Regions:
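A positively charged, amphipathic N-terminal helix/segment that binds anionic biomolecules
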Residues: 1-104
Length: 104
């Protein structure tokens, strides 16, 4: 690939980056909460469905954010945006590495 083509490919990727204000790192998980006693639904084996955003930090510390049902779609999109941003940044870095090679 020629240097001009590499630069154009990099610029195309840069224009496709999602809005950084609409990203979140983590995993969206569905969990079932069961109360130990006093809840007929839990005693029947059903439990309560909840959605959480799980984020693992440096050092192995994990944090979970409980989500309201109306937040699920937004958080799912933000997680996808983060994954897309990460993929695009890696691709841009690879193209920039190629631009650092001596011209042939």
């Amino acid at each position: 690939m020629k240097r001009e083509e590499i630069a154009e490919a990099r610029d195309r990727l840069a224009h496709q980056l999602p809005n950084p204000a609409q990203i979140v790192r983590g995993s969206l998980l569905r969990r079932t909460i069961r109360h130990r006693r006093g809840c007929p639904k839990c005693q029947a084996g059903g439990g309560h469905l909840v959605w959480v955003l799980t984020v693992t930090y440096r050092g192995g510390k994990t944090r979970q954010f409980s989500l309201r049902p109306e937040q699920r779609a937004q958080v799912r999109q933000w997680v996808r945006n983060y994954q897309r941003l990460k993929r695009h940044l890696e691709a841009i870095c690879e193209l920039n590495h190629q631009l650092l090679w001596p011209a042939e």
